[in-house]
Amino acid sequence: MTSRNQLVQKVLQELQEAVECEGLEGLIGASLEAKQVLSSFTLPTCREGGPGLQVLEVDSVALSLYPEDAPRNMLPLVCKGEGSLLFEAASMLLWGDAGLSLELRARTVVEMLLHRHYYLQGMIDSKVMLQAVRYSLCSEESPEMTSLPPATLEAIFDADVKASCFPSSFSNVWHLYALASVLQRNIYSIYPMRNLKIRPYFNRVIRPRRCDHVPSTLHIMWAGQPLTSHFFRHQYFAPVVGLEEVEAEGAPGVAPALPALAPLSSPAKTLELLNREPGLSYSHLCERYSVTKSTFYRWRRQSQEHRQKVAARFSAKHFLQDSFHRGGVVPLQQFLQRFPEISRSTYYAWKHELLGSGTCPALPPREVLGMEELEKLPEEQVAEEELECSALAVSSPGMVLMQRAKLYLEHCISLNTLVPYRCFKRRFPGISRSTYYNWRRKALRRNPSFKPAPALSAAGTPQLASVGEGAVIPWKSEAEEGAGNATGEDPPAPGELLPLRMPLSRWQRRLRRAARRQVLSGHLPFCRFRLRYPSLSPSAFWVWKSLARGWPRGLSKLQVPVPTLGKGGQEAEEKQEKEAGRDVTAVMAPPVGASSEDVEGGPSREGALQEGATAQGQPHSGPLLSQPVVAAAGGRDGRMLVMDMIATTKFKAQAKLFLQKRFQSKSFPSYKEFSALFPLTARSTYYMWKRALYDGLTLVDG
């Protein structure tokens, strides 16, 4: 039967042969086979009590470099072998000797090959690790190392992986990360108090990629040749063990080296004193401890920041867990507003940890109260929803809330009611804006007959305010006078005149009437017309402007005849509106259906023609209506119409040319910048031109 050592030797030999192949394909294939071989047996359980019963030797060089902020009562030991001794140090810490160093090396190579993307990009500490790799090539921070591109780092990673297949190779930072994942333990990377600019990237706790239990911690130190009092060159790794564990073993080889720890114990307690007594000053410590002033203040700053960061992280994580147990994870923006000191990567790491734990609590009372959101739904839909939610409640209570929110939005759209996001968020605060718009878009696709009907109230809405007062007053006067003349009763209540839902065509007709009345009154310039009524055609403004000269001059703007629409008059006006929509040159005559009693100031020729047409119940004929328009077009208004059309065309050409030049110079403006230069251009037009440019089209030739 093949022994464990022989299998490991065979695996390493196959990996070494695959290194000779070009690229990583052959090495990855060999690592897949090696994983199957190594998975047939697991790493032995580490023996309790630390190192075995053997003569241990304290590493004097590493001991002289042992930093003051590292864990106390620990000793770096001598480890024999070749290369950087990383795997020998880990084997010695776990099993007392370096017998399993080759197996750890093989498992680490397989881990780095099969999870290459994770260690280069997918890990939370990827940026820190890659920066440490840059600085591991030198002893000081330099611009050349800082600006190494990712492709160079990937090449260094591939070269290190290939070199790791041979026992005498040197290890780097990502070997520590991969080794932590192989051992399923944390690795405390102890870095000397040298190379201070790059030290934070190396002196840290390295956690495994995935761990199903609370991991223990191994202490491994970076050791090497001291260059000056501020610099050293890394050469190997040294295992660090606890002093009490070594004394419990009774190892005789440690006794001569124990006095060497005495001079280090006093200065090392400075940071612990600062953590216990934040108000401690430097004057109380400079006589007792050999600590410089800069080191003291750096430690005091670190201790204060440490306490603040620990408290903030604890409260932030507890808040996120509490929100998850209540039925949904708090969105990122809301979380960062509450805890700005927590990074995005930490938030997503905690979120994935909560979602991947698989431990969802029972449905809290808050979720039961969520059924009040669906109290207006039909009973059949609620029954179906209960069946779906009962199946989802077992997996995640957050899914129940999302299902209820989605059903609520779909039901509102099926009733031709569009709930704004701010109102939707009040009911379902855990749903993000993007999720809301995705659901709304899908629901609108399933309801093609949906028409966005603006809800009107007696107090008025923002839509009416944007249209102007003229959009409300003429319509209200029309309705009141029409009802009063027809029935002789009091005008109806405002609630009856303003229904909650209005068809889109009716709303557009009233908007057009309001615009026409303001143009006919002569107090609405063309620029304000374009801003107030962007959905109406500019030609309609000039047609109404020319018709304004046909009104009786004896009437003021408050004495404009208000129509009393009968059934035949309404039909005639609807046909007239449709005819004007088909032909932009058609004339929008004054309101039809006005009787001779309503207009007592001497009706004009056009008013008489309208009365004749209304009496017969038929719309106006084209030739009769075209005569005043032609006459007006030949005068001053006609010239203004032509000039305005030329100016509008030139204005659009300038806007297109501006966007095209900015697109070619790769500095495309935002809509805010564009609207400041071209305020009369609609937002949809801007995005239409932008999409055309990005699709490769040309807006302006030449």
Curated annotation (Swiss-Prot):
The primary site where this protein sits is: nucleus
Give the record's GO biological process terms: regulation of transcription by RNA polymerase II
Superkingdom of this protein's organism: Eukaryota
> A Gene Ontology MF term for this entry?
sequence-specific DNA binding
Q: Which InterPro entries match?
A: Trp_repressor/repl_initiator, Vertnin-like, VRTN_OTU_dom
Q: Region (Disordered): which ranges?
A: 562-625
Q: Where is the composition biased (Basic and acidic residues)?
A: 570-582
Would you tell me the Gene Ontology cellular component terms?
chromatin; nucleus
Q: Kindly give the SUPFAM superfamilies that the UniProt entry links to this protein.
A: TrpR-like
Its function, per the record, reads: Acts as a transcription factor that regulates development of thoracic vertebrae.
What is the official name of this protein in its record? Vertnin
Q: What species does this protein belong to?
A: Homo sapiens
